[in-house]
């Protein structure tokens, strides 16, 4: 729905000055947004499993205490592969044509996969921290919506108020979108202020963000799960 909405409703009013028009810049933003929603999906799914008692059944089995949460993140990440394929096909259907070659496109999708995997660990922590599945889903969307819409995913950040522009420049969604645009063969005209570190090094910043997220939330989530099982 977002692909069709932005492509055919809003796309005609946004000039990019690049071959292929708005859809070429739109698709990386839409795909990153979709992957970012992994956080909410993982959190609400885990909370629902806790509510139904499925987690208690797994705890009674002779398996590692961390196996459940690791399996949950890997399972949701595998689902992301299907989502990425569907999004790519939808993009191709509405005119998206990456021009960088198959190798760079595949690297871009690997980055997207890893971004979703990192965010799924945030979702695990949120799902274990909030008991109510409905509240968990709301918390997940409260986190992901500002990150996706206060970014360069759909429009230039240069027109934002300076405070919001600064946030958007360092937003991990913005760096992921900018990095994917580069890997897909596009100049990121919706990027941050020229010369800023995120705009000059979006792929490096994305890798740093993913590493920091996993470094923080993998041990936190496993510890949270072990404490809750006690």
Segments the model singles out, each with a brief description of its role:
Residues 6-15, 94-99, 103, 130-132, ...:
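Short helix-capping/hinge motifs at transmembrane helix termini and TM-loop junctions
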Residues 8-10, 127-174:
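Transmembrane helix segments
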Residues 155-200:
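Terminal transmembrane helical anchor/hairpin motif
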Residues 7-12, 48, 57, 92, ...:
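Transmembrane helix-loop junction
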Residues 65, 69-140, 201-221:
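Alpha-helical transmembrane segments and their short interhelical loops
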Residues 1-6, 22-94, 142, 148:
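Hydrophobic alpha-helical transmembrane segments of multi-pass membrane transport proteins
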Residues 20-37, 113-114, 202-206, 210-212:
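Transmembrane-helix motif of ABC transporter permease domains
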Residues 3-8, 181-230:
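Alpha-helical transmembrane segments of multi-pass membrane transporters/translocases
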